[in-house]
């Protein structure tokens, strides 16, 4: 029997995603498709399953049911490969706020076997003009 087909133009393709913690259903049948270049926000009250959903997409948490593809990969089965292609930045982190943008990228590049050049990453995220700025001086969105 053939498995489900996926929209290959989608960066994220989620079908019938479920996740429970004991008797509590945190994620109940989420369907989601995000295409290249789309901007997406997930909003909801505490306990709505936002963090669980994102952690499943990142490959840091196992789903109970449903199908997930991120960049064409199943995070549950190909998490290591996926993590080499994505980056997650939380608005508040434990990073030293007095490091510069460039110093911070150098520090995190050590987690990757084949990191991109620092200046390339800074350019990709639109922070070339903030290269030497201290992280503490950046806005939350930067």
Can you annotate each of these PLM segments?
Residues 6-142:
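ABC transporter nucleotide-binding domains
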């Amino acid at each position: 029997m053939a498995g489900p087909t996926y929209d290959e133009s989608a960066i994220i393709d989620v079908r019938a995603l479920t996740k429970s913690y004991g008797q509590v259903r945190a994620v109940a049948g989420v369907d989601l498709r995000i295409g290249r270049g789309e901007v997406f926000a997930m909003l909801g009250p505490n306990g709505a399953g936002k963090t669980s959903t994102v952690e499943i997409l990142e490959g840091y948490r196992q789903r109970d049911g449903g199908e997930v593809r991120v960049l064409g990969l199943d995070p549950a089965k190909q998490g290591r490969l996926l993590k080499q292609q994505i980056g997650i930045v939380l608005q508040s982190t434990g990073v030293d706020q007095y490091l510069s943008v460039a110093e911070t990228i150098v520090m995190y590049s050590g987690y990757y076997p084949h990191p991109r050049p620092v200046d390339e990453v800074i350019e990709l995220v639109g922070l070339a003009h903030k290269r030497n700025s201290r992280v503490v001086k950046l806005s939350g969105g930067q």
